[in-house]
């Protein structure tokens, strides 16, 4: 542990120099309008460092606050975070879920009573099967949503107990219900109409998805909205995610030619 700390101290000037080089490469843009974050690897990080599950989610929670600030400082307008999947919401132990929910609540309270959301005028929304969330968490979430509902400069969307397939199924059910009531005709249904039935009809398509931990998959994340997204996978666990990892993702995005399926 001592050697590791000494190594970090020695390498810190090199890191800051590289950070400056990266920023100079990307600072003139273009920047993605909507960034999706899959913050993966908290538990594996804890195992690798002989730490507890609580330590894992606490460190992941702190990192998310940091990354959110980086994105806002860069001028990113829309940020969506995959906080908890439907699969994990159903399969994780009650103890682990309570730990996750407690940190989500703590994060929302920091946003509600802190300055960052109001400084950048960030609208905060949640999507997913949020009825599965504890009542105290729902209360804070509702307060924050209400407090920021008129902000329109930035948007933070939290996907909690969320699954992309489930969202599409739920949208389809709503369309069928409206069709049976005579509110919609089959010939009227297109992509724009279908979007109106998603959890958040105003949520824009994602330009760049960033996933940590080295896993190369999307894990049922916003399937409708990432049809033409650029994907970037980082070989580091979420608690160790660095600013240079974010900037490398942005640099990769800037170098790609987006053809939107054409």
From Swiss-Prot:
Binds 2 magnesium ions per subunit. Gene3D superfamilies: Decaprenyl diphosphate synthase-like. Its cofactor is Mg(2+). SUPFAM superfamilies: Undecaprenyl diphosphate synthase. It catalyses: geranylgeranyl diphosphate + 7 isopentenyl diphosphate = tri-trans,hepta-cis-undecaprenyl diphosphate + 7 diphosphate. It comes from the Archaea. This is Tritrans,polycis-undecaprenyl-diphosphate synthase (geranylgeranyl-diphosphate specific).
